[in-house]
């Protein structure tokens, strides 16, 4: 009988990626097969997130439910990973002594040894929440594609130390994967028919990966190299930081058509005073200047962002500045949250002087405004021709197919299942609140998807690029040095 593994994942897309790698690793080394049923599992892992309020208590509530399973099955292995584990490892050990393995985001590659150690020494537990230098990627098996789109982590951690954020304390400072490792993983995915990659990192555009000859590959260089990989026709990335959005990255949008017309660039607030309190390192006008440059190159670029509502000291004027920035930029989507203090962060020491009622009212107004903008953009797409990557059957109607536009809109349409994993052109016939409908007008066999520039030319261009200094970009935003 095969051994079963159950993983529950909370939080960001990086956590989703890490959970996928855990499953692949434990399958390759120990033959564990994933199950959706925790009661059927031999190993249960909880991959946690510490961004939201009461994250720790949520973890202990979940562990309390799993303790009942362990009472009935003493050999069950329970592990806790992710950012809460990194931040609260000792507390988890004390409050939940039945947990066998506690590991951080940078030590998940050691899971097979940890589990083996616990199984060999009944009643013992293992805690490893250290920050080894991104060695986990050297220990992971070859990636397994799950559809035509895939996530690839290119760097870990963040060195910006925004006053509200726990990431530098839970995932460590910025460390980039060597460029050859990233390109190999993407090439392996392309061989498995992946057509779109989404590059992941807490501060992805701060990427500075080592090359085989001891040089530094910057994020803009990396994008050009990825675009040269045969079969990769779309490139996305998340999450980026405005301070790191240098001119060379703006320039990539002019000469790499594989880079999509959609950008997620968190701003958090439109008030310079609040941005300063957050230690974001830029102003609202500098943020908008970057967007203006991008839209000169890509007029149809759609934007999404993160917003924190009710940061300590936020006045009505500060909130109005955020609403003005939203109107000026024209966001398509947002991840917006009411501020809650994270233990150990500098902002936790500030007086939380915005009432809950004010926070809720402001959040409602902000989300309503962005929803209106998103609906307007959807209506503007009516009767336009859109190229979409077909991901699979529609989630609501299995007789239809589902694809995604460059600007990250889901389109449902009727078509043959043979086009799953391929690009098709559709004409948008209906704009719904959360998706679009379209009619199939062209399949990939009728397109010319060959790039006009040969891959060798792209590689030559990337190799000839001069190193970029970590100084000041064109709009006067200094690269942050902690």
From Swiss-Prot:
Keyword Protein transport tagged: no
Cofactor detail note: Binds 2 [4Fe-4S] clusters. One cluster is coordinated with 3 cysteines and an exchangeable S-adenosyl-L-methionine.
TM annotation in the entry: none
Subunit architecture: Monomer.
Protein's job: Catalyzes the methylthiolation of N6-(dimethylallyl)adenosine (i(6)A), leading to the formation of 2-methylthio-N6-(dimethylallyl)adenosine (ms(2)i(6)A) at position 37 in tRNAs that read codons beginning with uridine.
Family: Belongs to the methylthiotransferase family. MiaB subfamily.
Protein name: tRNA-2-methylthio-N(6)-dimethylallyladenosine synthase
Encoding gene (name): miaB
């Amino acid at each position: 009988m095969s051994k079963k593994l159950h993983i529950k994942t909370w939080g960001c897309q990086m956590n989703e990626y890490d959970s996928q790698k855990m499953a692949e690793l434990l399958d390759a080394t120990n033959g564990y097969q994933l199950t959706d049923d925790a009661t059927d599992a031999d190993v249960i892992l909880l991959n946690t997130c510490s961004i939201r309020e009461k994250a720790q208590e949520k973890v202990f509530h979940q562990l309390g439910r799993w303790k009942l399973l362990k009472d009935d099955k003493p050999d069950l292995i329970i592990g806790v990973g992710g950012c809460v584990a990194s931040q609260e490892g000792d507390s988890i050990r004390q409050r939940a002594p039945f947990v066998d393995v506690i590991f951080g985001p940078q030590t998940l590659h050691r899971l097979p040894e940890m589990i083996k150690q616990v199984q060999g020494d009944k009643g013992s537990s293992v805690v490893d929440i250290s920050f080894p230098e991104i060695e986990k990627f050297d220990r992971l098996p070859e990636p397994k594609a799950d559809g035509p789109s895939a996530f690839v982590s290119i760097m870990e951690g963040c060195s910006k130390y925004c006053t509200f954020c726990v990431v530098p304390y839970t995932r460590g400072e910025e460390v980039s994967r060597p460029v050859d490792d990233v390109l190999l993983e993407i090439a392996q995915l392309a061989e498995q028919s992946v057509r779109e990659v989404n590059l992941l990192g807490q501060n992805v555009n701060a990427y500075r990966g080592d090359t085989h000859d001891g040089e530094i590959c910057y994020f803009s260089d990396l994008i050009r190299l990825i675009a040269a990989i045969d079969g990769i026709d779309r490139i996305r990335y998340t999450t980026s930081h405005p301070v790191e959005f240098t001119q060379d990255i703006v320039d990539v949008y002019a000469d790499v058509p594989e880079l999509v017309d959609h950008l997620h660039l968190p701003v958090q607030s439109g008030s310079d005073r609040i941005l300063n309190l957050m230690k974001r390192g830029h102003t609202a006008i500098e943020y908008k200047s970057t967007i203006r440059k991008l839209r000169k190159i890509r007029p149809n670029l759609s934007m999404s962002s993160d917003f924190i509502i009710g940061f300590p000291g936020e006045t009505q004027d500060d909130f109005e500045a955020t609403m003005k920035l939203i109107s000026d930029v024209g966001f398509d989507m947002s991840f917006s949250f009411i501020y809650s203090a994270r233990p150990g962060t500098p902002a936790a020491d500030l007086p939380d002087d915005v009432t809950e009622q004010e926070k809720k009212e402001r959040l409602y107004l902000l989300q309503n405004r962005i929803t209106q903008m998103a609906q307007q953009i959807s209506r503007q797409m009516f009767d336009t021709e859109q190229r979409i990557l077909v991901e699979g059957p529609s989630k609501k109607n299995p007789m239809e197919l589902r694809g995604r536009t460059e600007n990250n809109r889901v389109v449902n349409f009727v078509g043959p299942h043979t086009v799953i994993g391929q690009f098709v052109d559709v004409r948008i016939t209906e704009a719904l609140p959360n998706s679009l409908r379209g009619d199939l007008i062209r399949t990939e066999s009728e397109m010319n998807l060959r790039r006009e520039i040969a891959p060798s030319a792209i590689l030559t261009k990337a190799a000839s690029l001069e190193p970029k200094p970590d100084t000041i970009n064109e709009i006067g935003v200094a690269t942050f040095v902690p």
